[in-house]
Curated annotation (Swiss-Prot):
It comes from Saccharomyces cerevisiae (strain ATCC 204508 / S288c). This is Eukaryotic translation initiation factor eIF-1. Additional factor that functions in concert with eIF-2 and the initiator tRNA in directing the ribosome to the proper start site of translation. The factors eIF-1, eIF-2, eIF-3, TIF5/eIF-5 and methionyl-tRNAi form a multifactor complex (MFC) that may bind to the 40S ribosome. Interacts with NIP1. Pfam families: SUI1 (PF01253). It comes from the Eukaryota. GO terms for cellular component: eukaryotic 43S preinitiation complex; multi-eIF complex. GO terms for biological process: formation of translation preinitiation complex; maintenance of translational fidelity; regulation of translation; regulation of translational fidelity. The lineage of its organism: Eukaryota, Fungi, Dikarya, Ascomycota, Saccharomycotina. Keywords: Acetylation, Protein biosynthesis, Translation regulation. The keyword GTP-binding does not apply. The gene is SUI1. PANTHER family: EUKARYOTIC TRANSLATION INITIATION FACTOR SUI1.
Amino acid sequence: MSIENLKSFDPFADTGDDETATSNYIHIRIQQRNGRKTLTTVQGVPEEYDLKRILKVLKKDFACNGNIVKDPEMGEIIQLQGDQRAKVCEFMISQLGLQKKNIKIHGF
């Protein structure tokens, strides 16, 4: 006979809070620059996609400038000028075939 109630349980912990589950999300964030200027950052794009080609299409479709930044902790991040969060989310779903549940939009 085993006693099952001796396990530690945190009632305030988020359900499904593991490191592997958070790594498969695509995070779209907005950052404030000078005054009204903003940057949109896209982090966590899966490895099978070519970030340079995605950036080229995003820049052309949204008529904005952008670049790819290499971060030691976060990996490669796409930066776009302006608030492009909704457009990037729609692009990821329609063009890349990603699911909306895997995309997190942060900011304001």
